[in-house]
Amino acid sequence: MAEKQAGLAGEPNPDCTVTAKAGPEVSSPGTSESRDYDSNCVFCRVAAGQEPETELLYCENKDLVCFKDIKPAALHHYLVVPKKHIGSCKDLNKDHIEMVESMVTVGKTILERNNFTDFTDVRMGFHVPPFCSVSHLHLHVIAPAKEFGFLSRVVYRRDSYWFITGDYLLEKLRK
C-alpha cells in the first residue's frame, strides 16, 4: 500500500486523476468560450510581454512561449507555456493533444538550442493540482536530471500524484 501511494513501483500512478474530459472547462482550441487572458495570472502577463524582467526565449510556435524558471532545479530549467490561459493539466481534453505534443517538442528544441542533447537525462512534465505553484498550464523542461538535489527529486518525481510526464499526460488524453 505505501509503495503504491508513494509511487515507488516505477509504474505510472494509476490513481492520478488527469482524465480526458468530454468538453472544455477553461480553454479549448478555437472556441469563443476560452478565457484567453487572465490579468491576475503571471504567466498570462509573461506571454503577453507585460513582465519585462522575464526574458522570452526563441520559440518557433506562435501559440506558446518559453522562458527560464525563476527557481531552477538544474542548469537547464525552462517553462513552456501556452499563450492562452489554461488552468492546469486537469483542464485538458482530447482537443489539446496537439498542443501538449507541441509543448514537448518546444521543450526538446530549447534544450538543443542550449547545447543539451542527452535526452536520457531530461525531466519534462506538469504538476498536478493542487501542487501547481502557478495556475496556468506549464511544462517543466529540466536537465540534467542527475543534478537534482533531494527536494527537486521529490518535487519533480515522474508520474507521481503531483508531477506527470508529457507522455503520461498524452496517454491519458488519448483514452
Curated annotation (Swiss-Prot):
The modification N-acetylalanine is found at residue 2. This is Adenosine 5'-monophosphoramidase HINT3. A motif (Histidine triad motif) lies at residues 136-140. It comes from Rattus norvegicus. One of its GO terms (molecular function) is nucleotide binding. Keywords: Acetylation, Cytoplasm, Hydrolase, Nucleotide-binding, Nucleus. The active site is at 138 (tele-amp-histidine intermediate). SUPFAM superfamilies: HIT-like (SSF54197). Belongs to the HINT family. Expressed in retinal ganglion cells. It is found in: Cytoplasm; Nucleus. Its main location: cytoplasm. PANTHER family: ADENOSINE 5'-MONOPHOSPHORAMIDASE HINT3, APRATAXIN-RELATED. Exhibits adenosine 5'-monophosphoramidase activity, hydrolyzing purine nucleotide phosphoramidates with a single phosphate group such as adenosine 5'monophosphoramidate (AMP-NH2) to yield AMP and NH2. Hydrolyzes lysyl-AMP (AMP-N-epsilon-(N-alpha-acetyl lysine methyl ester)) generated by lysine tRNA ligase. It catalyses: adenosine 5'-phosphoramidate + H2O = AMP + NH4(+). AMP binds at residues 69-70, 138-140. It holds the Pfam family DcpS_C. It is an enzyme of class 3 (hydrolase). GO terms for cellular component: cytoplasm; nucleus. The gene is Hint3. Residues 33-144 form the HIT domain. Forms dimers to octamers and even larger oligomer. Interacts with CALM1.
